[in-house]
């Protein structure tokens, strides 16, 4: 079969990683795959003036210059449009299925002729967080007639509580078990926690950072590790002496996860939370808020769930994990690893194909 995926851009976000992996999985099964995405957004005149006033030369130099995203790094066939614009029929080949992964690309997909493939909305988030004005457009996009597949039961529930039943199936994300894995290990010599750093408030890096600072009041030797696509910003400060990796190489990620005794997930809004699974696959227990797939993944003693927006509760969980005996921590580590490895991207791709074929 022939598949076309539509993306607004190629970046190193979790959502783009999911598309890249599905494209690889489908290609490995003998299907024809193409990913179509726009060129990077350019700075507006106002943004350029602000960058000059702030002497942010790196932002000016990077304006419009593409960083290799997950699609480019995956090696799957890719078509990059010349500039940020709507995707039209002339941009995509005829196919059996065409998959939109963002509300705007879903609207664009809806306008395409039937020859471009049966329309599929791979729902990776409830994107009302973009701007308050976008809510009506996002909801309208979700109501368009197409085959809908959500990446978590939490996301399906959140959307259908707002919009009513949408005949939506669920195919959970998995983790690349060849990329994310680690041998058994003991606790670190100095207690160490990590989290994904991002400036966007919805990602909750400020909650994780504050939790680390509070935990250090009781565990002064606590080490903190973080990585992210955003450079460190004074508006979202990292804890003192954080080992921070900006845009680390993909093969470096498992080392970062495996260097920690616990991984923190504090998102205010997330449709899944791939770092939870990635850390677990590297034998690192996770302390998380009940957002995205966290509730499904961290039950039965696999990890620790804490209240939303509560750095105090997250800090208490950090302290408790730091004070665990070596044997108890080892048990948590093995449970996390086992949970992450019970379901693979191969399984997810099989479920995706089954959903498409049965529809």
Regions found by a protein language model. Give the residues of each.
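Carbohydrate-associated surface elements
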Residues: 154, 174
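Nucleotide-activated donor-binding/catalytic signature segment of Leloir-type glycosyltransferases, i.e.
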Residues: 231-254
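Short alpha-helical donor nucleotide-sugar binding micro-motif in glycosyltransferases
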Residues: 255-260
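Aromatic "clamp/platform" in nucleotide-sugar-dependent glycosyltransferases that forms part
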Residues: 268
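Short hydrophobic beta-strand element within catalytic cores of glycosyltransferases
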Residues: 285-288
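Conserved acidic donor-binding segment of nucleotide-sugar-dependent glycosyltransferases
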Residues: 300, 304-311, 320-326
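A short, well-ordered alpha-helix in the C-terminal region of glycosyltransferases
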Residues: 327-342, 354
